[in-house]
Amino acid sequence: MIELREKNGSAVFVVKAQPRSSKSRVCGLYNGGLKVNLKAAPVDDAANRECCELFSKLFRIPPSRVHILSGQSSRTKTVMVEGISSKAAALVLEPFG
């Protein structure tokens, strides 16, 4: 199960990113968080932007509402989805874990 927290009315969870993949997608669970494949290379913040875009599409919100709180230069990232409660996020992320 995905470990979700709530911070100021926004869902927060951990993501393990795998850059330079053949396509961008959510793969499933990884140590209480989500594992994602990202097509972009980790250069010039491209993989971080793609990670935010991936979750914005998944939650059907603008990319500006998805933030990486920590791990900008790491494969393990803490992601916040602004304006989405942890309960609502759990429903969206349920198919992945």
Swiss-Prot record:
It comes from the Bacteria. Disulfide bonds: none annotated. Pfam families: DUF167. InterPro entries: DUF167, YggU-like_sf. One of its GO terms (cellular component) is cytoplasm. SUPFAM superfamilies: YggU-like. Belongs to the UPF0235 family. PANTHER family: UPF0235 PROTEIN C15ORF40. This is UPF0235 protein Ppha_2415. It comes from Pelodictyon phaeoclathratiforme (strain DSM 5477 / BU-1). The lineage of its organism: Bacteria, Pseudomonadati, Chlorobiota, Chlorobiia, Chlorobiales.
